[in-house]
A protein has these predicted regions:
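Residue-level signal for inorganic ion chemistry
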Residues: 65, 142, 185
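Flexible beta-alpha connector loops of hexameric P-loop NTPases
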Residues: 79-89, 116, 145-148
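Hydrophobic aliphatic residues
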Residues: 43-47, 100, 163, 189
Length: 195
């Protein structure tokens, strides 16, 4: 698959407007400021392909990027940013429920968490969306480069525990900054897209 053949397709505020062409959808989810856009950019080796928001909570729609006419990378709106009005938070909740309930959308999930901190209550809710969907997913612990070597294993264990991840769910340490974990995540995504 040619990752350089990537294009932004559309930004939707309703699941009814999601592409219906049957291509696999690899959905990226995570709280505001966890680095979803940066991870997508690192995967594609493109600096500013997925917009990196200056302010957290900037991605309020579902953004679709088509890769080589073979799959979509789906950037779900970030969550958990305190300054977002309650009405927006409720709209986010409805949008996520609709996306996860639509059987023709999600193929595979990539849930991002911050490797430095324990997952938040919102992260637990997001992990449950994935677990209840029955669709396969991985958890990516981003910002690995901000940890000391001695902190990596304990932090990964805490993430797995707080999110109640079954052993079958892969946890990938990642650095969008340095590229650690890129090859592993890419392999997992390409494998999922071919199923």
């Amino acid at each position: 698959m040619n990752l350089h053949n990537a294009e932004f397709v559309r930004s939707v505020a309703s699941v009814a407007d999601c592409p219906k062409d049957g291509l696999p959808q690899i959905a990226f989810a995570g709280k505001s400021n966890v680095g979803k856009s940066s991870v997508i950019n690192k995967l594609l080796l493109r600096k500013n392909f997925a917009r990196v928001g200056e302010a957290p909570g900037k991605t309020t729609h579902i953004n679709f990027f088509r890769i080589d006419e073979a799959m979509y990378l789906v950037d779900l709106p970030g969550y958990g940013y305190a300054k977002v009005p309650q009405k927006e938070k409720e709209r986010w909740g409805r949008l996520m429920e609709a996306y996860f309930a639509a059987s023709d959308t999600l193929t595979f999930g990539v849930m991002l968490v911050d490797a430095r901190h324990a997952p938040t209550a919102n992260d637990v809710v997001m992990a449950n969306y994935f677990l209840q969907s029955g669709k396969p997913f991985v958890v990516v612990a981003n910002k690995l480069d901000k940890l000391k070597k001695s902190e990596i294993e304990p932090n990964l264990a805490r993430i797995r525990e707080v999110l109640s991840l079954p052993e079958a769910v892969r946890l990938i340490p990642f650095s969008a900054e340095k590229g650690d974990g890129r090859d592993e995540l890419l392999t997992v995504i390409l494998h999922a897209a071919e199923q």
